Amino acid sequence: MKLCVLTIATLLVTATSLETQKEIAEGNELTREETPSLVEHKEDEAAAASEKRSCIEEWKTCENSCECCGSSTICSSTWAEGKEIKLCKNEGGTFKKVLHFIQKGISKLKSCKEGN
């Protein structure tokens, strides 16, 4: 009798563990299916970072144009290396305008002192 109960208990444990393994395997399949979308998401992030770098590089060459980052956006003017350039406003243009205003003020003070 004890042997019979032990055999039945072993069969139940085995059947349960097989079901658990099947659920785990199905979960792994779902994970594998999600992986391509995760890869696409990472590729999107890399493309966005590349576009942002491109825009920053473009600030230097974006003279007299409000087309930064490949699309027409609101720009602000600023000065860099002695010449006026346009910056994408959403990429920190306001900060650079304030910085330019301070630099321009200091430059005027220096030229006044040198002139007198």
Swiss-Prot record:
Signal sequence extent: 1-17
Organism: Chilobrachys guangxiensis
GO cellular component, one term: extracellular region
Tissue and organ distribution: Expressed by the venom gland.
Record-annotated membrane-spanning stretches: none
Propeptide residues per the UniProt entry: 18-53
Record's keyword annotation contains Signal: yes
Name of the featured protein: U30-theraphotoxin-Cg1b
A GO molecular-function descriptor: ion channel regulator activity
Subcellular location: Secreted
Main location: secreted
Disulfide bond entries: C55-C69, C62-C75, C66-C112, C68-C88
Comment block on domains: The presence of a 'disulfide through disulfide knot' structurally defines this protein as a knottin.
Keyword set, alphabetical order: Disulfide bond, Ion channel impairing toxin, Knottin, Secreted, Signal, Toxin
Region named Disordered: 25-45
Described function: Probable ion channel inhibitor.
Family, similarity comment: Belongs to the neurotoxin 03 (Tx2) family. 02 subfamily.
